[in-house]
């Protein structure tokens, strides 16, 4: 009988320090097939693994390059992004080494600012009013095939897999919301346009995803884990307008939003605190970002390049068929 394993039902709330632009258009993504943290994550032919991951991201600091801009927060003109993401996944083990996976994110994004509405300056926004926009729904789905390079039955203490997949444009790349404007008489009215790229649900392109993940036992209770991916988006721009309809387009290059590449990498240690009870602790680091130029295809359009660095402490609990991470 085929086995069904419920794995990686986790809640992750991470405090992230962002370096780069004030808003980096990074969408929640992870490696497709489990955690690869140790040999216990191995699957056998015919097994299914169902996963659910949650991540909360709060962004409020501004950088220009590596230079932090505290004056934006002091003046109250900083942009604040809040994103909650659920990553739903299912993995099927074709053989001991070949895995097929599908992942679908569910995103709830909210953004507040001054400059996108009345403006930052006192003469146009005397009360310094802040307004919000949002985009909620499914993101871009991913289909991935991955392969353990070493025979899992012979290399229990260390192994790594490589994967190749497609990212499909199932998320709305032109999510709309209302933006506030202040008339000359001080009255308020709204216009509708696409929300900022940093909270869009999708990018509108078919991407090619290359990933790697693995583990290595270091000591009797300690193992190293690592994973990462690079997602290439050959499409140049999508049809989401970057410039508001009441503004003049001064640069045709950024009239529409760019369909940008994305990357991420994670590395950390997993320590078995109480092996018999299935309790462990993890400490890792994550970097994720958007490059200024794509690997394949054009790099036109408006994009928010930069990267986010996060520290990821955690506690895990494992049973015969379930693994929970917090």
Task: Show the residue positions of the predicted features.
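Transmembrane beta-strands of outer-membrane beta-barrel proteins
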Residues: 48-52, 100-102, 143, 158-164, ...
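Residues that define the transmembrane beta-barrel architecture of outer-membrane proteins
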Residues: 46, 82-86, 127, 135-141, ...
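Residues on the lipid-exposed face of transmembrane beta-strands in outer-membrane beta-barrel proteins
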Residues: 39-41, 52-54, 88-92, 102, ...
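Surface-exposed strand-loop-strand hairpins of Gram-negative outer-membrane beta-barrel proteins
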Residues: 26, 56-85, 198-201
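Short loop/turn motifs that connect adjacent beta-strands in outer-membrane beta-barrel proteins
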Residues: 21-24, 38-47, 59-61, 97, ...
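Extracellular loop and loop/strand-boundary signature of outer-membrane beta-barrel proteins
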Residues: 37, 71-76, 125-133, 195-200, ...
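Transmembrane beta-strands of outer-membrane beta-barrel pores
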Residues: 54-60, 104-110, 140, 149, ...
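Outer membrane beta-barrel transmembrane domains
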Residues: 63-67, 72, 236-326
């Amino acid at each position: 009988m085929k086995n069904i394993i419920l794995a990686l039902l986790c809640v992750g709330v991470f405090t992230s320090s962002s370096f780069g632009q004030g808003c980096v258009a990074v969408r929640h993504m992870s490696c497709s097939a489990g955690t690869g943290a140790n040999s216990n994550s191995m699957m056998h032919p015919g097994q299914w693994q169902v996963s659910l991951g949650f991540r909360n991201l709060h962004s409020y600091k501004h950088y220009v390059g590596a230079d932090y801009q505290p004056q934006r927060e002091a003046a109250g003109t900083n942009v604040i992004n809040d994103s909650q993401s659920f990553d739903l996944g299912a993995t099927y083990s074709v053989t001991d080494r070949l895995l097929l996976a599908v992942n679908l994110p569910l995103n709830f994004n909210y953004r507040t600012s001054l400059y996108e509405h009345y403006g930052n300056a006192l003469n146009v926004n005397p009360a310094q009013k802040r307004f919000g926009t949002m985009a909620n729904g499914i993101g871009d789905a991913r289909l991935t095939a991955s392969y353990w390079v070493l025979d899992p039955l012979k290399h229990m203490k260390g192994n790594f897999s490589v994967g190749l997949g497609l990212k499909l444009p199932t998320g709305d790349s032109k999510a709309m919301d209302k933006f506030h404007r202040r008339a000359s008489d001080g009255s308020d009215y709204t216009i509708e346009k696409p929300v900022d790229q940093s909270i869009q649900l999708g990018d509108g392109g078919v991407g090619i995803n290359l990933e790697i993940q693995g583990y290595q036992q270091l000591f009797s209770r300690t193992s190293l884990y690592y994973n990462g991916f690079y997602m290439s988006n050959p499409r140049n721009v999508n049809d989401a307008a970057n410039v508001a309809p009441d503004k003049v387009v001064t640069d045709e290059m950024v009239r529409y939003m760019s369909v940008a590449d994305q990357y991420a990498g994670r590395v950390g240690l997993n320590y078995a605190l109480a092996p018999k009870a299935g309790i462990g602790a993890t400490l890792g680091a994550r970097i994720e970002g958007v490059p200024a130029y794509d690997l394949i295809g054009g790099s036109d359009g408006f994009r928010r390049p930069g990267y986010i660095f996060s520290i990821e402490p955690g506690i895990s609990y494992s049973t015969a068929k379930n693994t929970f991470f917090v």
